[in-house]
Each structure stands twice: as C-alpha cells, then as structure tokens.
Amino acid sequence: MKTYTAKPAEIEKKWILIDAEGVVLGRLASIVAMRLRGKHKPTFTPHMDMGDNVIIINADKVQMTGDKRDAKKYYWHTGHPGGIKHRTARQVLEGAHPERVVIKAVERMISRNKLGKQQMTNLRVYAGAEHPHEAQQPEVLDVKSMNAKNTRSA
C-alpha cells in the first residue's frame, strides 16, 4: 500500500477560536502549533500547509507558571556593537503589544523554514476579547477543559 499524500484540492482549513484567558502559555502554544501544522488531522502531510486558521483572543491575560513572568527574558540585537537588549515577559505583557508573547511562543514551536512562515500567517492573535473574523464563523476550542493543568488562577 502506498503512503497517503494529500493533494492541494483535498486540504480543508477550518477557523478555530481560542480564548487564552487564564491558560498556561506553553500549553496553549503547543496546542496552537499542532493546529497550525495540521498534525491533528488523519490526512497530515509533512511538506504541505494542512493546518487550520487559528484566532487567539485575550492574549494579554495568558498565565505563566513559577516566576517566568519576571525571570523570562526576550532578547534582540540592534545590529550595533554592544547592542544586545532584553525585556522581561512582564514588561512585554504590560506594554503596547502584549500579544507578542503568545506569537513568539508559538513561532518557536513551528519549524523555521518557508513552510513554517506560511503556517504562521494562519495565526491571528488579539490582546482583547474583540476580533474581526466573525464572518469566518470560527468554532470555539476550549483549551481550559482539555486538561486541568492547562489553567492557572492569577
């Protein structure tokens, strides 16, 4: 029997809505990365963009375990000598773009190549509860009820 390979016409993409309020960041990112790659589908083909379109709301209310909110640092370099910079997760979450914490966590769980970049375009993250994708009729994925460890209280 030959190995099944999906054809572009057979790929069916759904829209998934996830509420990140109170959900542990790493567990959320792992589930989202799996959905973006399409590994939850029985027709998964590694070299094709099979994943769903994922919308994450309330990204500013995501939780972290331990002291990661203060200890975890996001580094970047300005390109100038001695230009290494960093911000803690707390500074990013309280800043102008708190959704970047979730985007970066998911981005680091997706492969770093052309396919990975294509899959990341299917992710939309919003800091608040509002999103402009009602016309796509996304189905809600309740990450909190999947496992008791997926949530933390403040």
UniProtKB/Swiss-Prot annotation:
Q: Per the record's keyword annotation, is Ribosomal protein included, yes or no?
A: yes
Q: Which CDD domains match?
A: Ribosomal_L13
Alphabetically sorted, this entry's keywords are: Ribonucleoprotein, Ribosomal protein
GO molecular function terms noted in the UniProt entry: mRNA binding; structural constituent of ribosome
Could you name the domain of life of the organism this protein comes from? Bacteria
Q: Does the keyword Ribosomal protein apply?
A: yes
The UniProt entry's GO CC annotations, sorted and at most eight, read: cytosolic large ribosomal subunit
Q: Which SUPFAM superfamilies match?
A: Ribosomal protein L13
Q: Which GO BP terms apply?
A: negative regulation of translation; translation
Region feature (Disordered)? 132-154
Per its database record, what is this protein's job? This protein is one of the early assembly proteins of the 50S ribosomal subunit, although it is not seen to bind rRNA by itself. It is important during the early stages of 50S assembly.
Question: What does the record note on quaternary structure?
Answer: Part of the 50S ribosomal subunit.
The family this protein is said to belong to? Belongs to the universal ribosomal protein uL13 family.
Q: Return the protein name.
A: Large ribosomal subunit protein uL13
